[in-house]
Amino acid sequence: MKDKSIKVLEFNKIQEFLKNYTCTKAAKDIIEDLKPYDSVYEVREHLEETKEAFKLLITKGAPPFEGVYDIRSGISLAEKRSTLLPGQLLKIAAVLRCARRFKEYINHKEEEESYRVLENICEGIFSLPKIEEEIFNAIEGEDEIADRASSTLYNIRRSLKEKNYSVRDKINSLVRSYSSYLQENIYTVRGDRYVLPVKAEHKGAVPGLVHDQSSTGATLFIEPMSLVNLNNEIKELMLKEKAEIERILTVLSAKINANITGVKTDANIVWELDFIFAKAKFASEYNCTCPTINDEGIVDIIEGRHPLIDRREVVPISVKLGEEFTSLMITGPNTGGKTVTLKTVGLIHLMAMSGLMIPARENSVISYFNNVFADIGDEQSIEQSLSTFSSHMKNIVEIMDKADENSLVLFDELGAGTDPTEGAALAISILENLRKRGTKIIATTHYSELKAYALKKEGVENASVEFDVETLRPTYRLLIGIPGKSNAFEISKRLGLPDYIIDFARENISNENIRFEELIENLQEKSIKAQEDARLAENLKLERDKEKKKYEEKLEGLQKVRDNALIDARREAKNIIKEAKEEADKILKDIRQLERMGYSSDARRKLEEERKKLKDKLDSIEEKEIKTVHKGEALKNVKEGDEVLLASINQKVIVLSKPDNKGDVLVQAGIMKITANIKDLRAAKGSNSNSSSSKIKKSKKLNLNLRRVESSVDLRGMDAEEAIYTVDKYLDEAYLGGLGEVTIVHGKGTGVLRKTIMDMLKGHSHVKKYRLGEYGEGGTGVTVVELK
């Protein structure tokens, strides 16, 4: 990729923007060296890592980069077996902690989306928690070693503290004794030794060692002889403390050196992740999307925005290239946005090929090009004494020498700066030569000859930047398929140029040129109208899809409620049957107990008969229930993924496991996973019309009930028996309707009805808890019930 083109397209400014989102100098250095990658595979992988980081920012929030540093200098010293400073060790530990936490941050549950590229990067993390912990345990700050760093250090500092207390007690006593000889009744420290500020004329009155004097010489700082030994002991302890700290730092530094490969690897991964997440943060800030990358020269930028233009003012452009045509000629007035269009296309390609998401709509397509050449702006050099034309031609010669079918070439005002006739002819020749090579070209021009060339030549298409003649301002919108119209006469007229001058000018233009311009104007108007209609249709489609999605979600929610209600009802029915059977067995057990106690065996026989009748009747009810749900033969074999009918709940389910030795299988019913026996499974296609009809009717009835259920029931005016029946029926409907909380209005009155309702609620199967209403809810006139 040519460095000159990268500079012209201002990719360096994107790099500077990216640096603002990094946490470390090392990541900034990675961005400084960022350039388009050398293969389409690399581009896709680096785009994927950016996309994954972007998703993680949304789903998990900010990554764990707190306290991460650039530790390259510390690593370099550790490699040389040097002893590191406390601050350097702390920063290394912080980076190791960041690497470990990032591994935890990237982890996901089985049902969550995976992050393939980032997970592969994080697999290289060594994780050195022991070293990390030792450093944080031993060092508390940039220049502070913790007492707990070693038992020796702890003992030294404890002794040092005790000695200091002793010296301070002693010197305070001396201050009182020598107060008449001192400048001030205080003590101070000179060279780690406690001294007294003695007046120079009384130096003989305080025997001791002189350590310093004031700037005027009026005060001598004397260490009393009685403190010399104590001060010596303190000094010795301080030297021991220093030696122990040095030993601790040496040991920790040696551990870094012993694990230098892991430390360097973890640090490099953290810096790479810092760079990747800087790309993601940039994408989030600039509303970027991940484009589809191909290597076939196909470009489809949908509403691309130049990232260096103020987001409140930038006008999105849509550009296609490479399928129906490989060359695009853009015409239009000066300051109309032609050059911005070229730079937008070029810069978006450089961003995508450097692994950055692009400021464009979803589903945009970018092609990987080996080279992007840009001849944009006036690049003439005063030192080289080159004219505008010569400067452009120098660039073009270099482009012609290197461009091939895997190149994108951007020409701004091709052929300008010389005689229009010769310039147009030269431009057509250059374009045609590159087109035959298969080069993808976007060029801006003022020449009508190039408009005509694009109209005639297959594989070349016209485009124009829209201009509003009413306001005399460009709209900056790109219209593909329509050549730009010269607006010189209209602009001149609106600016006040007399009509007779404009009319005379028109007479000097050939009829063919006039008709050509009129044709272009007509095409522009039709194209603008068609694009407006297309935008309106797109907006209507989006609105329709939005409404459709909303109602589908509502329908799905109701379906889930229905499924859960059916499953709960069937499960409750089975529990009732099971409890009845257990009760019958309990009765029989009691009868046997009575018989052992001497009661008549005849009574036992009669109760045994009653039990058998009850059991037979319950079995009959259960069998009848299953049969009425669905007629058909039980399946003999099923496999994972089969869609079958679970007869007991009349519900289609998906088989999740093979039958075990008891014939039990795991199935998915709606959003629930339940265990069922293979005998309860039927072929999904085997349901007859009657059962289907029955199922539909039940479903409709349930949905109807769900729509009608209210959040409160009014019992005022009812007697106790009627109120209990009404509340019981209402709670069933509210429970099936999925209501979490309901209100029972019973009025205040004498309180009899309230007490009756509360007694009933105590043992109700649907009630989780209840309470009297609060102020604003109805007070003691209502009872608020929370359902299970």
Curated annotation (Swiss-Prot):
The keyword ATP-binding applies. Its EC number is 3.1.-.-, 3.6.4.-. GO terms for biological process: mismatch repair; negative regulation of DNA recombination; rescue of stalled ribosome. Pfam families: MSSS, MutS_V, Smr. InterPro entries: DNA_mismatch_repair_MutS_C (IPR000432), DNA_mismatch_repair_MutS_core (IPR007696), DNA_mismatch_repair_MutS_sf (IPR036187), MSSS (IPR046893), MutS (IPR045076), MutS2 (IPR005747), P-loop_NTPase (IPR027417), Smr_dom (IPR002625). It is an enzyme of class 3 (hydrolase). Gene3D superfamilies: 3.30.1370.110, P-loop containing nucleotide triphosphate hydrolases. One of its GO terms (molecular function) is ATP binding. Keywords: ATP-binding, DNA-binding, Endonuclease, Hydrolase, Nuclease, Nucleotide-binding, RNA-binding, rRNA-binding. The keyword rRNA-binding applies. PROSITE patterns: DNA_MISMATCH_REPAIR_2 (PS00486), SMR (PS50828). Residues 713-788 form the Smr domain. ATP binds at G332, P333, N334, T335, G336, G337, K338, T339. CDD domains: ABC_MutS2 (cd03280). Endonuclease that is involved in the suppression of homologous recombination and thus may have a key role in the control of bacterial genetic diversity. Acts as a ribosome collision sensor, splitting the ribosome into its 2 subunits. Detects stalled/collided 70S ribosomes which it binds and splits by an ATP-hydrolysis driven conformational change. Acts upstream of the ribosome quality control system (RQC), a ribosome-associated complex that mediates the extraction of incompletely synthesized nascent chains from stalled ribosomes and their subsequent degradation. Probably generates substrates for RQC. Homodimer. Binds to stalled ribosomes, contacting rRNA. PANTHER family: OS10G0509000 PROTEIN (PTHR48466:SF2), OS10G0509000 PROTEIN-RELATED (PTHR48466). Belongs to the DNA mismatch repair MutS family. MutS2 subfamily. This is Endonuclease MutS2. The gene is mutS2.
